UniProtKB/Swiss-Prot annotation:
The gene is CCDC175. The keyword Ribosomal protein does not apply. Residues 131-164, 203-256, 282-373, 426-534, 565-627 form a coiled coil. The lineage of its organism: Eukaryota, Metazoa, Chordata, Craniata, Vertebrata. The keyword Cell membrane does not apply. This is Coiled-coil domain-containing protein 175. PANTHER family: COILED-COIL DOMAIN-CONTAINING PROTEIN 175.
Length: 724
């Protein structure tokens, strides 16, 4: 008996002839030993190649699709499992060889009848082993073919990966350029918006400054009016004082005339006294006593006169103090007038400069608005170009994905065709049950595909309904957006009208301010002329008063020279009495004037306090009004900003909705194409199933014929064996 031994290269599908291992029943029993490196060289090479591929997959330089990576990883795992299976089969074969050697030893000790039966069993087992070996050989060849196909597929995927990597780099460069252009455009837009905001803030600040200047001008006008009123009051007081001084001068003239008359009378009395002196020498003693008494009374009167002089000096000092204060007040009023005039001039210059700056800023705003419109148009163009590029990129990616799916389907179809050819080659040796199972599987696949087609049609109908609802919703939202935009435009037009009305009011107010400044200048010129005239008149009156005082002094000197000592004493006594009376009258008049001045000062302080309080109230009200106006302007500006942002967001939403509508349309067209392809595939499958059923009937007849021949040959061989 001879049994074929296990070849070491059987598991790898080699085309060499299988060596025969002799199994003898004699004493020289050969053990079936197997080498430890059964098919290890090719397996190790494959594993090394797969390890290299795995390392390249794990590295960042290698670029490939995730499907290809997963496929290669699965292949590596399958090869590792095959290597483990190979080692396990080697171990099992060694165990079986040991058992066979033990059985051969047992066979030597058994009788001949039993050995024959065992030989027949071994023959049958050998035949079964040969059939299994042939099946394993076919499987190994199939695995080798699959490995070669996988290698080819790996090479093809590598080429695709390189092409896709280059395409990806090109797309990345193009995308980087687009991103840089977009960033540059956004940067320019940001700079323009910042410049516009700065100009807007400058305009607001200048408006606030103009309002402050207007308020200051109003305050200054009010101060000027008040100062005018005060000046008129002072002027009236001065006129009254001048009239009083004139009256005093007239009274003094009358007094001087009376004094002259008295002097004449005294001269007459002097002559009479000289005449009487001669007659009154006898009565000198009596007169001496009277003179002593008179001297004592004169001393007393001198003390009183000194006290009166002191009081007069005090009153004169007070008068000088009041005069100095009056001069200081006049100087301060003149200084304040000059300062106010300078301020008014500065304010007029500032107003002129502000107008020029306002004109320049308006021109800048006009240019900036033009630039902003140009930038917006450029941004719209760039955005449209981006959309076109993005749509083209998506179309290209979809086209590439479709091509990849088509290629994968074609590869799968080629695989299936190859497997079908192999199965057709093996169908000669297969049974009817296999054909029936395949037919059942095909029927089940057909039913599944029909069910899938029905499900896809149902999904398409649902999607159409959803799309119709979505279109209705979008139309309603677009209508609402149009209404909101119209409302925003109406608000914007109203705000523009309000701004135009306010600008008109501001221009009218500026014209009024200019008219008031001109009127103030004219009134100030007239006031200055009147002041000069009054000063000239006062200087004339002072000169007259000084001349009359000099004349009176000269006359008094002449009187002093003429009168003797006794008469001088009497005259001084009389003069001092009169002066005393005059001083009392002047003191009373000055006290009255002092009281009037105190009352006027108190009234002036009260008026000044009221003026300060009123100015504070006016300033507070102006601050409140400014804050209210600034708040209104800010609120209007924020409303405009929010409306612009809402319009921009609605534009973006509409663009996104349009893009989604386009994508849905493309996806629906893609689904329609897939449905048509599935329908065509179903028709092709029906045709192929009909062809396969015909081939199955033919092969079934061939198989029945071959099976009959096989049984006839078996029967003939059994008969021959029995005959032998």
């Amino acid at each position: 008996m001879a049994l074929s031994s296990w070849s070491p290269e059987l598991g790898l599908g080699s085309e060499k002839a299988l060596p025969v291992a002799a199994v003898s029943t004699g004493p020289s029993l050969e053990l079936c030993t197997f080498p430890s490196t059964l098919g290890s060289s090719v397996a190790t090479d494959a594993l090394e190649q797969l390890l290299v591929v795995e390392q390249s997959l794990q590295s960042d330089y290698f670029k490939c699709n995730e499907e290809a990576k997963n496929f290669l990883k699965d292949v590596a795992i399958a090869v590792k499992k095959l290597e483990e299976m190979r080692k396990s089969t080697i171990d099992l074969l060694e165990i079986e060889s040991m058992e066979l050697s033990r059985l051969y030893f047992v066979l030597e000790t058994l009788p001949t009848s039993v050995s024959r039966e065992l030989e027949e069993c071994v023959r049958d087992a050998r035949r079964v082993n040969l059939v299994e070996m042939s099946e394993l050989h076919t499987k190994i060849t199939r695995i080798n073919d699959e490995i070669e196909f996988l290698k080819k597929k790996i090479l093809h995927l590598q080429t695709d990966n390189t092409a896709l990597g280059e395409r990806q780099e090109e797309l990345a460069k193009h995308y980087g350029k687009i991103v840089l252009s977009v960033n540059h455009a956004m940067k320019e837009k940001a700079t323009t918006t910042i410049y516009i905001n700065e100009t807007y803030t400058k305009i607001n600040l200048e408006k606030k400054e103009l309002e402050l200047q207007k308020t200051y001008i109003q305050e200054i006008e009010e101060q000027i009016e008040r100062e005018r009123a005060e000046y008129l009051k002072k002027k009236e007081k001065l006129n009254q004082e001048i009239e009083e001084y004139k009256k005093l001068c007239e009274l003094k003239r009358k007094e001087t005339y009376a004094k002259k008359k008295e002097l004449d009378k005294l001269r007459l009395t002097m002559t009479k006294m000289r005449e009487t002196v001669t007659t009154s020498t006898v009565v000198l003693s009596d007169h001496n006593l009277e003179l002593a008494r008179l001297q004592e009374s004169i001393r007393e009167w001198e003390h009183k006169i000194e006290d009166m002089k002191k009081s007069c000096k005090i009153l004169e000092d007070k008068m000088l103090f009041f005069k100095n204060n009056r001069e200081k007040l006049d100087d301060s009023s003149n200084f304040e007038k000059s300062e106010l005039l300078l301020k008014i001039k500065q304010m007029t210059e500032k107003l002129h400069n502000c107008r020029l700056e306002n004109k320049a800023l308006r021109e800048k705003l006009h240019t900036v608005s033009r630039q902003y419109k140009i930038v917006l148009n450029e941004e719209d163009k760039v955005f449209m170009q981006k959309r076109k590029i993005y749509s083209e990129n998506q179309k290209q990616l979809a086209f590439i994905a479709q091509k990849e799916n088509f290629l994968s389907k074609r590869k799968v179809d080629i695989k299936n065709m190859e497997e079908g050819l192999i199965t057709l080659g093996e169908l000669h040796r297969a049974t009817k049950e296999v054909y029936r199972k395949q037919i059942k599987i095909l029927n089940e696949n057909m039913e599944r595909e029909t069910q899938r087609c029905i499900i896809t049609q149902w999904k398409i109908a649902c999607l159409r309904k959803k799309h119709a609802r979505w279109v209705k919703k979008i139309k309603d939202e677009i209508k609402e957006l149009i209404d909101k935009i119209q409302e925003a435009e109406n608000r914007r037009s109203e705000l523009i009208e309000e701004t135009s009305i306010r600008e008109h009011d501001i221009n009218e107010f500026l014209a009024k301010i200019e008219q008031l400044t001109l009127e103030l200048k004219q009134e100030e010129d007239a006031f200055v002329i009147k002041e000069r005239k009054l000063i000239q008149e006062l200087s004339k009156f002072e000169q007259r008063f000084a001349e009359e005082a000099q004349i009176s002094k000269e006359k008094e000197v002449e009187l002093d020279k003429c009168l003797p000592q006794l008469q001088v004493a009497e005259e001084e006594f009389t003069d001092k009495n009169r002066k005393f009376q005059n001083l009392i009258e002047t003191v009373t008049a000055q006290k009255n004037e002092q009281n009037l001045l105190n009352n006027n000062i108190s009234q002036f302080t009260r008026d000044f306090i009221r003026y300060i309080n009123n100015t504070k109230k006016v300033k507070q009200e102006l601050k409140q009004l400014r804050e209210h106006e600034s708040y209104k302007t800010k609120a209007h500006f924020e409303i405009l900003k929010s409306l612009e942002n809402e319009i921009y967001l609605h534009d973006l939403k509409t663009d996104a909705l349009i893009l989604e509508n386009k994508r849905l349309k493309e996806y629906i067209a893609y689904l329609k194409d897939n449905i048509e392809q599935y329908e065509r595939g179903g028709e092709d499958l029906v045709r192929s199933s009909s062809d396969l059923s015909c081939q199955l009937t033919d092969l079934q007849t061939q198989y029945s014929d071959l099976w009959a021949e096989f049984w006839t040959t078996l029967k003939k061989r059994r008969k021959r064996v029995l005959l032998k």
